[in-house]
């Protein structure tokens, strides 16, 4: 709809609920706080949006199963009206915000990703026509950006006013050939693990490299910030 009004000559601001609403949950995990009426929107969904051609976002198109027929029937922005898109806007609604910690969790690092989208020029990968080359370049650039957030930006946030209760996503984990492999959405944060089924705490072992497991080990993972605050844990199935 935004392109319709921009093409009619109106100055418009994009506020896309499927990418720019901070109160949308990113997956079906019941531990997440927020809403899902506009789908599941994670940090990468926000980062990959092409403001001037939303269907040029191949990551979002594929994730949301948007058909070729739908794309062809939808109004596109006339290049001559590009200047009518004067910005983008994020939203955070308070229906599910019951305390300050939930506000922090929805706000940060969402605002970091959104600010990068709002204040940066179009990335080069958006101009790549070859699908394989585009996807590999996109993944490379996204990996750089999320490493920057985890290793440089969030440690600064930890020291502002004693830190914010920003989102600490559950780590990812898999067990292959009796070996544990784990990662996090923002490399640089601390992944703690236990193998006895207990809840990882700040004194638990750090995950730094793949770990060989015993047959009866029960693995739990949990992400921690530099102030010792932990996120929700996850148990890794064998």
Model-derived features: positions:
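Flexible, acidic glycine-rich loops studded with aromatic residues
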Residues: 1-171
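Short, compositionally stereotyped local motifs that mark structural "simplifiers"
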Residues: 131-238
